[in-house]
Amino acid sequence: CLKDENGHLFDRFRGRVIFPFFSVSGKVTGFAGRLIKQSDKAGKYVNSPTSILYEKKHELYGFYQAKQAIKREDCCYLVEGQLDVIQLVQSGIENVVASGGTALTYPQIRLIHRFTENVTILYDGDNAGIKAALRGLDMMLEEGVNVRVVLLPEGEDPDSFARKHDATEVLEYIKQHQTDFIRFKTK
């Protein structure tokens, strides 16, 4: 709970869709809440406060559900948001996790690296996504991860793209448009 200006308690997640975060062993550790209606007063996302169980920099949305597919496919698709994960999984792509925005962290990279050395960054094609992909590339290379980047068509994010295409089409697009870190950084 939080307090408003008048000292009244209210639920920090009110008016939001709630996404649970799970530990590697499947226990709920925290939540992210996304606004249902856009507001100038409130941030788009709110996370659980940092605790013994939950620290945002260590969390990857969907990791518990994706870890076996990541191991089986020997590849992890890294997206920005929870809705990106949900839509890609619904389209049939299971080896996908979200960093929870564009702020990828070393603990998140190390968690992925425990299950695969191969990561494909599939961030939004906007300026923020491109900048985040560049930062993420350097961090992953420092951690010894083989990293590739896919930029989606302008105006698309993984959620919207997967709504328009089935898994075969999404995977074909990734195959045709993925680029290694050298080519991506020199574009």
Residues of each region from the PLM?
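Phosphate-handling DNA/RNA-contact segment within nucleic-acid enzymes
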Residues: 1-115, 119, 133
